[in-house]
From Swiss-Prot:
The gene is prc. Involved in the cleavage of a C-terminal peptide of 11 residues from the precursor form of penicillin-binding protein 3 (PBP3). May be involved in protection of the bacterium from thermal and osmotic stresses. It is a peripheral membrane protein. It catalyses: The enzyme shows specific recognition of a C-terminal tripeptide, Xaa-Yaa-Zaa, in which Xaa is preferably Ala or Leu, Yaa is preferably Ala or Tyr, and Zaa is preferably Ala, but then cleaves at a variable distance from the C-terminus. A typical cleavage is -Ala-Ala-|-Arg-Ala-Ala-Lys-Glu-Asn-Tyr-Ala-Leu-Ala-Ala. This is Tail-specific protease. GO terms for biological process: proteolysis; signal transduction. It comes from Salmonella typhimurium (strain LT2 / SGSC1412 / ATCC 700720). It is found in: Cell inner membrane.
Amino acid sequence: MNTFFRLTALAGLLALAGQSFAVEDITRADQIPVLKEETQHATVSERVTSRFTRSHYRQFDLDEAFSAKIFDRYLNLLDYSHNVLLASDVEQFAKKKTVLGDELRTGKLDVFYDLYNLAQKRRFERYQYALKVLERPMDFTGNDTFNLDRSKAPWPKDEAELNALWDGKVKFDELSLKLTGKSDKEIRETLTRRYKFAIRRLAQTNSEDVFSLAMTAFAREIDPHTNYLSPRNTEQFNTEMSLSLEGIGAVLQMDDDYTVINSLVAGGPAAKSKSISVGDRIVGVGQAGKPMVDVIGWRLDDVVALIKGPKGSKVRLEILPAGKGTKTRIITLTRERIRLEDRAVKMSVKTVGKEKVGVLDIPGFYVGLTDDVKVQLQKLEKQNVNSIVIDLRSNGGGALTEAVSLSGLFIPSGPIVQVRDNNGKVREDSDTDGVVYYKGPLVVLVDRFSASASEIFAAAMQDYGRALIVGEPTFGKGTVQQYRSLNRIYDQMLRPEWPALGSVQYTIQKFYRVNGGSTQRKGVTPDIIMPTGNEETETGEKFEDNALPWDSIDAAKYVKSDDLAPFGPELLKEHNARIAKDPEFQYIMKDIARFNAMKDKRNIVSLNYAQREKENNEEDALRLARINDRFKREGKPLLKKLDDLPKDYQEPDPYLDETVKIALDLAHLEKEKPAEQAAANK
């Protein structure tokens, strides 16, 4: 599953107010409203099209070929799993795919609305069929399987093939609940409520939903960071910028019927719990003292409305971990106000023998970061640390000015980043103060979620030879977006009945390193690459549809501060020797082997109860064995079952632990270098 990397989101969509209202059971297709374009949408479409075609960094023609691509994307947004529409439905509308560009320019979006209305009808038929399937006896003893990802599969050719897909879907839903311990009666009651609720949702869909989906299909076909924001999402964007969110600190998105964790806000309740990961699915939400509400199939904004609440109140989330497992867990979080100021740099000191390494954990490039880092550097200097590690893992970026000024703390002066617009004009952003605030050994730790401003800093430190970069190749987001309202001053005078018209966010520039290479797609390749664990590996700009290409420009004029390349072989040798014996890295290597062995089958799950229970038990047994291995090494009493795990238990961080050791290796080598140079000069 590719995710859209949103650098503007502080707590995702957790401030969206959903609309939930009572609706009687929908039993006929004619009870589903036929959605039509609202009067303001024609103007909005014209303005969006004009903005994208004239001002976007990627220069493109909204011709028939591009129109066809928009159609295909819209189709997949409507029916991601290819289990709602028939092949004949797709074929019927495919004849009109080349006219979408004209529709966007004129604002007459007939194809978009007609196709959406057909999908609504087909979705109603599917859930009606699913309710009938629930009446059948449950049997989980066969060898059936279910494909979790049908996004590349052909559309079903007839209703019989479609029914077979939904037989499997219902069986998957039933088995997922059975594995949580529910009885057959409870399973039927839960799924009946879920499917009827999904049908009622169809009656609550409005014209803006169709329009937003059409604009999203258009925007995403240009590049993955270009967006149309509906009036509601524009309000949310402005709320985020005013730093007044209250929630759990997570960016959410829909994936088929599931609400999925897209990313976590550093310092927020979800991140601090250490119990929620990117890719996890929220399947239930419960308020204090109230029963858990099944939210599978809900609209995203309504799930968000349940999660939101007053600061200090508690919310329970039923989490289905990423992957194909079906064992859920309940997590209780205390809602907090998510403010950018709360995401400040955190300093710690790691001791290895008699030596000390300072660690600066930077979750985001907020305004004021550089001044905060100066203060922490002074504290570390007083503690006489041997080396410093800057941890940029999961740092999605932030203020470009802070990336430049932070880089300036570690070099005398010089260009930090080059920025080019779509006219080819290049500017340099430089450090000019001539002051170095820290001259000692420096290591920067990155991962696949380090993006944008993080990559600018890491690239500058690497190009200047100022720091050793370790970890995973970074995300590869090397573009700049601009936000613009679609409202005009005269709108309210001429059309006072119109609501707000929303806004757009689109790409206008690209970043380039001082060596001339772009950070786009390729990101920053570490000097020492750590093995990647068992998480989803297809994360990064190069996996996003329509990501702008990598390219290069002339290098800026800069003078390297140092050259760490001669230390590379020795540092790598020591690193490899350590991780070959480190139990935590041995776990990681085994997970990699397991992941690769199952790669082709990771989306195919068994619908056999005994097989699935065996898989779940094996996962639990593996985790328990590893925890007990750690406890044994630490001299702690062993656990009999996972339920006995202390609530304050924290998983080790082998990547940071190893980076600290690399930082000490670098300090030793840099200390030896002057003596070697003096001997060579004699």
